[in-house]
């Protein structure tokens, strides 16, 4: 029974976990510190530490919360973190579970702005080639700003003064606060849903601090400005203020009044320009008419108009010369053709087929006779050579040798005996004469050296 007073490790960790859960001060903790051991894990949960001068605590930030972080955390950066404290049972260690993280201080806002600007610049959102041209004579202008501020008043007064023809439509939105970015995006999407109804859009607000102007630096607002089909004029803050909306817009104006001036032409200036063009056009037309009248007078007073027949004298002379040249050319052509005809007849006579056929017949007979004579000579030569070869063969024939009284000897196997070294005593031999054979038996073998061997 004494063992019941001992807790298991799991039981103890569970008890401590419940203590943390039941402590209201640990349910929502606002913590500030410096990021330590931060290693960004792509598409995953983040594990790091927060520290100050004296201590540190382990932090876990699940992916669903980290994806909402609007800046790029880095090692050593000071941050504000919101979350709760709990125990990780398998290791028996308590840690901080972060649900939100923001950079600490105004310097952090500038750092966040800098990081987003670099990111969007790499994507090409600020490139000049993406800038759209502002139309010169807009029919309808959409304005995204606060409904109660001086911005819309300045824009409408300026636009109506300069170009009353243009219609101004306000799409009210919050321009400051936590929900301002969402409100700005919603207003721009309403404009985009109208298709090509609007020729240009103005987005802006009055001056303020960096925190006041921050909605115009939010990534979703900047991307929506970039995606608008019509040209966008940005007028956020004073001339010294520059937001990311100013950079991505097709044009930037220092004030709302300047934005309205950028979007609309000055009607009086345009009318003055039209009157000036009309005057120039009228003057040009008068000059052209005067020049044409002077030319007409010169033509009417010319000798050709007074005596029209002279107009054709030169042409008639030209026609006569051309006729003569044509006749001469035809006669020359005819003469050349006759000469060519005579030459062709001469060539045809020279190559008369009957004459060529007779020549070929005579040549064939001559060649046939030469072939017959050559064949006779050839056969005669071959017969003589054949007779000589037959005589030589007959002279070297063994039968001729036998006719002169010589014999040749073979053993009983029919092999020719040419030396006494091939026979032994009592061997049977055959002696061959020209008219028959004689069987013989060796009685004695006697070897004699001839004259060549003695030498």
Swiss-Prot record:
Q: Which GO terms describe its molecular function?
A: exodeoxyribonuclease VII activity; nucleic acid binding
GO BP annotations listed: DNA catabolic process
| GO cellular component term of the entry, any | cytoplasm
Enzyme class of the recorded protein, top EC level: hydrolase
Q: Which UniProt key words apply to this protein?
A: Cytoplasm, Exonuclease, Hydrolase, Nuclease
Entry EC number(s): 3.1.11.6
Which compartments does it reside in? Cytoplasm
Q: Which reaction does it catalyse?
A: Exonucleolytic cleavage in either 5'- to 3'- or 3'- to 5'-direction to yield nucleoside 5'-phosphates
Q: Mainly resides where?
A: cytoplasm
Q: Give the UniProt family note.
A: Belongs to the XseA family.
The subunit structure is: Heterooligomer composed of large and small subunits.
Q: What does this protein do?
A: Bidirectionally degrades single-stranded DNA into large acid-insoluble oligonucleotides, which are then degraded further into small acid-soluble oligonucleotides.
Name of the protein in question: Exodeoxyribonuclease 7 large subunit
């Amino acid at each position: 029974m004494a063992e019941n007073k001992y807790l298991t490790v799991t039981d103890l960790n569970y008890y401590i976990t419940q203590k943390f859960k039941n402590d209201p001060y640990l349910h929502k903790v606002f913590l500030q510190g410096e990021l330590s051991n931060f290693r960004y894990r792509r598409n995953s949960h983040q594990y790091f530490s927060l520290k100050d001068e004296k201590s540190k605590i382990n932090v876990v930030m699940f992916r669903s919360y980290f994806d909402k972080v609007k800046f790029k955390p880095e090692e050593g950066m000071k941050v504000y973190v919101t979350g709760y404290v709990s125990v990780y049972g398998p290791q028996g260690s308590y840690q901080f579970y972060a649900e939100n993280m923001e950079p600490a201080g105004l310097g952090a806002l500038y750092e966040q702005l800098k990081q987003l600007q670099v990111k969007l610049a790499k994507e090409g959102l600020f490139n000049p080639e993406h800038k759209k041209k502002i139309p010169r004579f807009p029919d309808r202008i959409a304005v995204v700003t606060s409904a109660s501020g001086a911005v819309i008043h300045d824009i409408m007064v300026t636009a109506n003064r300069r170009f009353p023809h243009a219609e101004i439509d306000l799409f009210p939105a919050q321009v400051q606060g936590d929900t301002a970015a969402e409100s700005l995006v919603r207003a721009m999407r309403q404009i985009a849903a109208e298709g090509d109804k609007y020729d240009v859009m103005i987005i802006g607000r009055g001056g303020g601090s960096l925190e006041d102007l921050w909605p115009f630096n939010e990534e979703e607002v900047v991307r929506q400005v970039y995606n608008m089909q019509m040209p966008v004029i940005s007028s956020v803050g004073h001339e010294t203020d520059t937001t990311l909306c100013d950079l991505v817009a097709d044009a930037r104006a220092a004030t709302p009044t300047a934005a309205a001036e950028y979007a609309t032409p000055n009607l009086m200036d345009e009318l003055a320009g039209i009157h000036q063009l009309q005057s120039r056009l009228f003057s040009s037309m008068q000059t052209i008419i005067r020049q044409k009248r002077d030319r007409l007078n010169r033509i009417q007073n010319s000798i050709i108009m007074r005596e029209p027949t002279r107009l054709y004298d030169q042409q008639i002379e030209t026609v006569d010369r051309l006729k003569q040249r044509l006749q001469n050319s035809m006669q020359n052509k005819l003469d050349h053709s006759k000469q060519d005809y005579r030459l062709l007849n001469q060539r045809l006579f020279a190559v008369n087929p009957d004459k060529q056929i007779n020549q070929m017949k005579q040549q064939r007979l001559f060649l046939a006779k030469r072939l017959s004579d050559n064949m006779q000579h050839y056969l005669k030569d071959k017969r003589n050579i054949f007779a000589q070869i037959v005589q030589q063969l007959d002279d070297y024939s063994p039968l001729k040798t036998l006719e002169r009284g010589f014999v040749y000897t073979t053993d009983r196997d029919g092999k020719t005996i040419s030396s006494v070294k091939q026979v032994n005593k009592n061997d049977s031999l055959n002696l061959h004469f020209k008219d028959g054979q004689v069987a013989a038996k060796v009685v004695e073998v006697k070897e004699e050296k001839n004259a060549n061997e003695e030498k």
